[in-house]
């Protein structure tokens, strides 16, 4: 199918599930900052007036979890009259954390394929499959639908924080539908923005008048700035623009819906444009291959596309708990590759070390939280883990690796 419409969504940092992702990753940052060897599997639940922190943690670090949780909620914007019914200062915070199972830790500490190579000694923290993807639709080598959805969500949060639109509240979602012809993006079919807001705007209380005001403001202050540097731009007369289709969005955040860590895995990755192994990222230390190997798979896929060995690349990795080396490596280029997929797989095995300890070392994952002032993984917990123009993420830095791949591939041309 070469002509189609593809749709992806994003959510703001005030979405209930994203509150949870950010809290879980803030806990991870705090623990790794004090103890880089911390083992963390932290889950968060939010609901009306409640935040529950649970999971398994083994660490020498001492963290004031209640204070940390309240600070994250406050920084997102849920405080006082701007809280929209959920307040960092008054919500109950419950902490129910255990230590990591010794049966799991022994497999991570002492890999099944242990030998004299130290990086063979750290086994994968669980079994599983992970996918990485890249394509040449955008400068950051991401699919256009999810890239644009994130741009809109980031700009929506920005105009709220800066009080350009002072009636906005923290919860919000974006969705973008792109027209494709012959497999290439050609136009923006539909933009949908749902944003929480005050019940009254500058004296306006009529529901339809409020929605029209928000729609006009969002086009001017969110859509236009978020897309001004794109080759494909929205057209006010052709692009369908939907805002708060139910009519109003006053009750939101945890007051409106419960939130859980790990429920926005498609938002976190490629917007449904590529396959997903099912594992969430947030709240997991780097020994969990759900996270670290997914970063590595993106690194491999992006390197392939950057080296112009394919226009699209999807990489699947699989692991067994307690075993260092991947069980399997698969690359798919969707008939866009300049060399065979078998040759690409050979290059991957030669140029990428995909053992958990090697991935952790390559990206410095244990030490980045301290290096970044205690705030690294939390920044990835909203607006996507890949293709971030606003963050310096090591798995996105592929210039050197792509150059090596390009040179090495010449023997197959």
Swiss-Prot record:
Which free-text remark accompanies the cofactor? Binds 2 divalent ions per subunit. Binds 1 potassium ion per subunit.
Read off the Pfam families from this record.
S-AdoMet_synt_C, S-AdoMet_synt_M, S-AdoMet_synt_N
GO terms (BP aspect): one-carbon metabolic process; S-adenosylmethionine biosynthetic process
Q: Which CDD domains match?
A: S-AdoMet_synt (cd18079)
Q: Does the keyword DNA damage apply?
A: no
Q: Where does L-methionine bind?
A: 56, 100, 257, 288
The entry's protein name is: S-adenosylmethionine synthase
């Amino acid at each position: 199918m070469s002509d189609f419409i593809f749709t992806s969504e994003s959510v703001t940092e005030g979405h209930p599930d994203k509150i949870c992702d950010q809290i879980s990753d803030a806990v991870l940052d705090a623990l790794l900052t004090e103890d880089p060897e911390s083992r963390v599997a932290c889950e968060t639940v939010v609901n009306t007036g409640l935040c529950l922190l649970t999971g398994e943690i083994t660490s020498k670090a001492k963290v004031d979890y209640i204070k940390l949780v309240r600070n994250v909620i406050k920084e997102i914007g849920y405080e006082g009259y701007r809280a929209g019914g959920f307040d960092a200062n008054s919500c109950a915070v419950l902490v129910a954390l255990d230590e990591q199972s010794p049966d799991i830790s022994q497999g991570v500490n002492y890999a099944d394929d242990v030998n004299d190579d130290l990086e063979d000694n750290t086994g994968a923290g669980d079994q599983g499959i992970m996918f990485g993807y890249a394509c040449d639709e955008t400068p950051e080598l991401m699919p256009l639908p999810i890239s644009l959805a994130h741009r809109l969500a980031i700009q929506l949060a920005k105009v709220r924080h800066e009080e350009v639109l002072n009636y906005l509240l923290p919860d919000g979602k974006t969705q973008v539908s792109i027209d494709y012809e012959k497999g290439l993006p050609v136009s923006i079919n539909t933009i949908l923005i749902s944003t929480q807001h005050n019940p009254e705007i500058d004296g306006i209380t009529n529901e339809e008048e409020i929605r029209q005001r928000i729609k006009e403001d969002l086009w001017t202050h969110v859509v236009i700035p978020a897309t001004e540097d794109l080759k494909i731009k929205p057209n006010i007369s052709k692009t369908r623009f939907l805002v708060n289709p139910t009519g109003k969005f006053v009750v939101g955040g945890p007051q409106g819906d419960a939130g859980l860590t790990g429920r926005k895995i498609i938002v976190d990755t490629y917007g449904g444009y590529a396959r997903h192994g099912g594992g969430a990222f947030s709240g997991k230390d780097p020994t969990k291959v759900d996270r670290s190997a997914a970063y590595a798979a993106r690194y491999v896929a992006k390197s392939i596309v950057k080296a112009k060995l394919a226009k699209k690349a999807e990489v699947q990795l699989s692991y067994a708990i307690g075993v260092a080396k991947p069980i399997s490596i698969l690359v798919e280029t969707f008939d866009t590759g300049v060399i065979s997929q078998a040759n690409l797989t050979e290059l991957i095995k030669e140029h990428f070390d995909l053992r958990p300890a090697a991935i952790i070392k390559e990206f410095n994952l244990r030490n980045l939280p301290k290096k970044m002032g205690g705030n690294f993984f939390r920044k990835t917990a909203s607006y996507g883990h890949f293709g971030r123009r606003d963050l310096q993420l090591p798995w996105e830095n592929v210039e050197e690796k792509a150059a090596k791949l390009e040179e090495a591939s010449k023997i197959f041309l």
